Design a protein with these regions (language model features):
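Bacterial N-terminal signal peptides that target proteins for export
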Residues: 1-10
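Surface-exposed interaction/gating patches
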Residues: 136-161, 166, 172
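Axial heme c-ligation environment in periplasmic c-type cytochrome domains
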Residues: 61-68, 86-119, 124-135, 164-169, ...
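The canonical Cys-X-X-Cys-His
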Residues: 42, 46-56, 112, 116, ...
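Gly/Gly-Pro-rich "capping" loops immediately C-terminal to redox-active cysteine motifs
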Residues: 32-39, 43, 55, 59-85, ...
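Residue-level signal for the nucleotide or nucleotide-sugar donor/cofactor binding architecture
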Residues: 37, 75, 104-107, 140, ...
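Electrostatic cytochrome c docking/interface patches
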Residues: 21-44, 121-148, 233, 240-248
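C-terminal motif of bacterial Sec signal peptides marking the signal peptidase cleavage site
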Residues: 16-19
């Protein structure tokens, strides 16, 4: 009997010692749930707030791809952060900052901004390409924009922007009502590679569309918005630099 008693006592003692550090009913660390404003994990923040429009990996969504080195080479952190925090007026891009009625703290927005660039950007990607500026630097001329459209865009999007064999209509008032001037400019610069649309360099091989021509095309498109649309007063294109793209 004694030979069995001692091993049993040792086992019971060991079990008691193991239980001392975890009182019955006390949840372990794995059961702790962070408050929404305490989450500082990019995958969670991006997945819950951005992936629905921009795609699970920063591409493939309805909005412009964020995991696009061309976009990240022309858009600076301040522009990306501003669009994330304050949204884009008149578009589907909401404000996420608590100060603007959203749910995210400044630190969370800073994290999203920095991680988008560190994960998907390529330092120096367009250093030798002399890309157009992210924002317009001058007023656009709709008449000149129509001519530039005919040169660079009509082959895909058709006469007047009403759709062609390769591209959809971009003069549709329903579309123009949902995208800002800056959004149009960004799409022209970066293209939509996932949809087969080239960036500003490749519409005509060896003849990239110029910064001013982009500004003019945006002015021409903006002039076709319905007057009741939120951007109806932006046809001069002078406020592009104050707006963020529909997808940042």
């Amino acid at each position: 009997m004694n030979t069995l008693r001692y091993p049993v006592l040792m086992i019971l003692s060991f079990m008691l010692l193991c239980g001392c550090g975890s009182p019955h009913g006390k949840p372990g660390k794995e059961a702790e749930i962070l408050a929404p404003d305490q989450i500082m994990d990019f995958a969670i923040l991006y997945g819950e707030n951005c992936a629905g429009c921009h795609g699970a990996e920063g591409r493939g969504g309805a909005a412009i791809a964020l995991a696009d080195p061309v976009y990240l080479a022309v858009a600076d952190d301040a522009s990306i952060r501003n669009a994330t925090a304050n949204g884009v007026r008149g578009t589907a891009m909401p404000a996420f900052a608590q100060s603007a009625g959203g749910m995210l703290t400044d630190k969370q927005i800073d994290l999203i901004t920095s991680q988008i660039r560190s994960r998907w950007g390529r330092p120096g990607f367009l250093n030798s390409a002399n890309p157009p500026s992210y924002s317009a630097k001058s007023a656009g001329n709709p008449a000149q924009g129509a001519l530039a459209y005919n040169t660079y865009c009509e082959s895909c999007h058709g006469p007047g922007g009403h759709g062609g064999a390769k591209g959809s209509s971009i003069a549709d008032p329903a579309f123009l009502a949902l995208v800002s001037d800056q959004g149009l400019r960004t799409i022209i610069i970066t293209g939509r590679p996932e949809l087969g649309a080239p960036d500003w360099r490749a519409n005509i091989p060896g003849k990239p569309i110029s910064d001013q021509e982009i500004t003019d095309v945006v002015a021409w498109l903006a002039s076709q918005r319905a007057q009741s649309a939120p951007h109806a007063n932006s046809t001069s294109n002078t406020t592009q630099h104050q707006e963020s793209t529909n997808a940042r």
